[in-house]
């Protein structure tokens, strides 16, 4: 997974995207909400779409890897359902990029103000 983490980092160096090794077999990718969704909306913005395309490419290069977590935040003061709807939009974008549903965790509402993906090998 270190090779895939480094490959993704090379694409997003100098951007607000954070890619961090979590263990020998997993890394996380986080993107600030402002680069992902307009306030109150669930449509994926182009910066997040570009990142999801690269994550999909990475998963295709590592057929045993999975998305262990797909989480998105809501907006301050918004209904909690917004976060889950956004996570579902992220998942749909990954499906459209060729990532099979069987390789993704169910979408979840995230905490904080970032879209969070955890990539790794299932235990």
Regions found by a protein language model. Name each.
Residues 1-26:
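N-terminal targeting leaders that direct proteins to extracytoplasmic destinations
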Residues 3, 7, 47-54, 85-89:
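Extracytoplasmic/secreted proteins, especially bacterial periplasmic and envelope-associated proteins
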Residues 24-28, 112-114:
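A generic structural signal for beta-strand entry/edge sites
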Residues 30-38, 52-87, 104-111:
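Short, surface-exposed beta-strand segments enriched in small/polar/acidic residues
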Residues 40-48:
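Short, glycine-rich nucleotide/cofactor-binding loops
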Residues 85-123:
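Periplasmic OmpA/Pal-like peptidoglycan-binding modules at the C-termini of bacterial envelope proteins
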